[in-house]
Every structure is written in C-alpha cells, then in structure tokens.
Regions:
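HTH-adjacent hinge/linker in prokaryotic transcriptional regulators
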Residues: 2-37, 41-63
C-alpha cells in the first residue's frame, strides 16, 4: 500500500483488532504485504491517538 492508502490500512488494522482481540506485527505485515517497520509505525500512530495499546510483537484493544 502506498502512503495514500495508510488511513485505509490503519482502519483495517482497527477492524481486525476488534474482530480478533489481538493482532501481531508479523501477521499484519503479511496480510497487508508491507514491512514490519511500516506496521509498527501504524500501531504507534494508532496508540498515540488512543485507539489501541501496543504490546511486544503486536497490539491489543484499549480496555
């Protein structure tokens, strides 16, 4: 996905998190065919906005 698709990817990450309860960086990178670094940046941005909590290797929903 290109930079213009970043908001859509982040939206999809939140949808997956809602469905699964937990997501891993590795699985997200494979699913979206992007690097783990990109996924970590996405998770960091979403955490900054209070939308999830990052954990080692992934993320969980905000309680």
């Amino acid at each position: 996905m290109s930079k213009r698709n970043t908001p859509q990817r982040r939206h999809n990450i939140l949808a997956l998190l809602s469905e699964q309860g937990e997501v891993s960086v590795d699985a997200l990178a494979k699913r979206f065919a992007t690097s783990e670094v990109t996924i970590r940046k996405d998770l960091a941005a979403l955490e900054t906005n209070g939308l999830l909590l990052r954990r080692y290797g992934g993320a969980v929903p905000v309680p």
